[in-house]
Amino acid sequence: MGNDKTNMIIAIALSLAVLLGWNYFVAAPQVERQRQQQAQTSASPSPKEGGPSAPVPGTLPGASGGNPQAALTREEALARSPRVRIDTEALKGSVALKGGRIDDVALKGYHETVDPKSPEIVLLSPAGSANPYYAEFGWVGQGAGPLPNGDTVWTADGDLLTAKKPLTLTWDNGAGLVFRRTLSVDDKYMFTVEDSVENKGQSAVTLYPYGLVSRWGKPHTQGYYVLHEGLIGVLGDKGLQEYTYDKMAKENPLGSPGTRGLSWPGVTGGFLGITDKYWAAATIPDQKTPYTGSFTERDEGATKVYQTSSLGEARTLAPGAGVQASQHLFAGAKEVSTIDAYRQKLDIKQFDLMIDWGWFYFITKPMFKALDFFYKLFGNFGVSILVVTLILKLFFLPIANRSYVSMAKMKAVQPEMTAIRERYADDKVKQQQAMMELYRKEKINPVAGCWPVVIQIPVFFALYKVLFVTIEMRHAPFFGWIRDLAAPDPTSVLNLFGLLPFAAPDLVHLGVWPIVMGITMFLQMKMNPAPPDPVQAQVFTFMPIIFTFMLGSFPAGLVIYWAWNNLLSILQQYWIMRRNGVKVELWDNLRTTFSRSSPVKAAKG
């Protein structure tokens, strides 16, 4: 019968309405109020009482001298500065002695494609290359003489930076200040940057430590609503802040001419950086010292420069005194275990939000933990998806059982419901009253069929999010032709699943697993008789076909989950219906569906 399917549509519509309504009426107004408050704060930065004027966010270094009109090759840009090599288990690259920037980082073990011989992922690139992307640390201030900038050439105490061998850079400004920077890196993706200044001059100076990540040009993005790519940070009690590249263009002027952005003064704890789907670069200020965080977009010729920066409080150095500032830089893959470990070890506020877990965080992250647990047990994320789906089915079995029992009762009274519709065909009010009386008499809950679908919606979105955003799913194989669960099924019916020598267009991409999913969805719907309403009957007839094509471009892992979940639902419903003495109409419905043309054939005969 059609009530359970009608309930399914209602449940999906209501769930989507709740999600969209929350975003429109609650989340969006809150974000807009915060944006306006931040813009007002940013527009008029005030000097610190009793001291020199603080530098204005948006005027920090790092947003100049980056990209010449004719971009150099990456190798040519690297050769413009003497360098100290970086070599760890997870990273390779170099530190530029000119500018003291970390601007050359590639990720070992991560490749551009599923082919292990494809190039490794390059995360950071130097100024002057086609797409500069780098991290910079230093000092700004007044009356201190020359300060280190992008043209400063530092002196290094070694020629290699490893997890066991730190690197110290030194520079004397010739005006009484000696700058030292000690760089260290662990065996994953975290750099520690310890800056110190010694005042050998005759007068006091005031300096402000800063750290920034600068990216030249808008990168290619996935363009999905469920995924944030762009500027990201947790700014103390201001919480998570996410700004896309396009959104930055709409911000108010800040600092230097041609610069737009916003700032958060006086925050403590958190991080600021730029994130891609799987990779990120972020500076991490001292978690106990207040700072001003800022996001900016700057026009540099025809190029947009995106920058996140933290500006620490004023440090005054008397003659003969010294000062230190310690920060961190994360530059690498957003591995869940690594991100969580850094959050705990370095006590970085909400660092786990570097990964876009989405609205269903409370479901999404436990979902990943479960998948990861069974992956470590079986060594295959595809098998892990099957096991977790089975466990979820067993966990929700009591609710599903009550739902299917109610549906079975509704099937049993189907003749009476049909009679009521015929008896009150012209009086919908009396028809509804008679239906409700029948439900009360037979102790039937007409909306019970919604619950399995309502429960499945957040689980579906959570699994979709896990497959879509976690790097652990990237290039994770299943069996056979599925070499990447995070990518669509590579086969296509249009080229006979690879037998014909041409690639099928993405628009009509339809692989083996989407077809399997469509078949299981079709069988699940045939477990119940067609609804009496012809329009509903047509909708449910075409629904498996629509979903088959729609899921053709979805991650293979998600399609496998849906097909497996459909199969388990069929078995579960079959068992419950048999247990309650209700006839399983699957085979009768299939015979009816595939024999509809028989009378026509007989007439022709």
Swiss-Prot record:
It is a multi-pass membrane protein. GO terms for cellular component: plasma membrane. One of its GO terms (molecular function) is membrane insertase activity. It is found in: Cell inner membrane. One of its GO terms (biological process) is protein insertion into membrane. Residues 35-71 are annotated as: Disordered. Its main location: membrane. Keywords: Cell inner membrane, Cell membrane, Chaperone, Membrane, Protein transport, Transmembrane, Transmembrane helix, Transport. CDD domains: 5TM_YidC_Alb3, EcYidC-like_peri. Pfam families: 60KD_IMP, YidC_periplas. Gene3D superfamilies: 2.70.98.90. Residues 35-47 have a biased composition (Low complexity). The chain crosses the membrane at residues 8-28, 377-397, 451-471, 496-516, 540-560. PANTHER family: CYTOCHROME C OXIDASE ASSEMBLY PROTEIN COX18, MITOCHONDRIAL (PTHR12428:SF65), OXA1 (PTHR12428). Interacts with the Sec translocase complex via SecD. Specifically interacts with transmembrane segments of nascent integral membrane proteins during membrane integration. NCBIfam families: PRK01318.1-4, yidC_nterm, yidC_oxa1_cterm. Belongs to the OXA1/ALB3/YidC family. Type 1 subfamily. Required for the insertion and/or proper folding and/or complex formation of integral membrane proteins into the membrane. Involved in integration of membrane proteins that insert both dependently and independently of the Sec translocase complex, as well as at least some lipoproteins. Aids folding of multispanning membrane proteins. This is Membrane protein insertase YidC. The lineage of its organism: Bacteria, Pseudomonadati, Pseudomonadota, Alphaproteobacteria, Hyphomicrobiales.
